[in-house]
Structures are given as structure tokens and as C-alpha cells.
């Protein structure tokens, strides 16, 4: 499908996948790996978008991005939401 897979990172560092079966479910890095690997197997050209809260630590985003790359995600985007003043 042409819809990107969205990985949300909250400012607390918790990670969520925006897919119907996992909505609102906090994932460990292992769970993230398993789920994303399955989706990439089904669709190797899947675009993955990391959506980080404005206050999320940059290192956390980099860790997730590196994980996605190691799983074979080729097309990774990044959206950051600015914290509200």
C-alpha cells in the first residue's frame, strides 16, 4: 500500500506503531522489530515515518532510525512536532 507506516515516539521515550492492531500499545524495541520486520517482508518498499514529539531526545530517534535501517527499511522519513509553548 502507499500509506506510510508511522512509528510514534513520545517525549517519555515510549514507542508506538500506528497500525490498527497495535493502536495505543506501547512497544519494546523487540516488539517493534518483530512487527516492522513482518510488514517489510510483506512490502519491501514500505515507507516508514518516524513521528517524534517535540521534546523527544534526538538520540532516541536515532536509535529507532538505525533499527529500522537494519531491518531493511529503505525509505525512512522523520516528522517532528514542535512542543507547544
Predicted regions and their residues:
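Long, low-hydrophobicity, acidic/polar, solvent-exposed interaction domains
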Residues: 1-85
Amino acid at each position: 500500500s502507499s500509506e506510510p507506516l508511522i512509528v510514534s515516539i513520545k517525549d517519555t521515550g515510549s514507542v508506538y506503531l500506528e497500525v490498527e492492531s497495535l493502536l495505543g500499545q506501547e512497544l519494546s524495541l523487540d516488539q517493534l522489530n518483530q512487527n516492522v520486520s513482518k510488514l517489510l517482508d510483506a512490502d519491501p518498499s514500505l515507507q516508514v515515518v518516524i513521528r517524534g514529539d517535540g521534546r523527544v531526545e534526538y538520540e532516541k530517534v536515532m536509535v529507532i532510525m538505525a533499527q529500522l535501517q537494519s531491518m531493511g527499511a529503505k525509505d525512512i522519513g522523520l516528522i517532528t512536532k514542535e512542543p507547544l509553548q
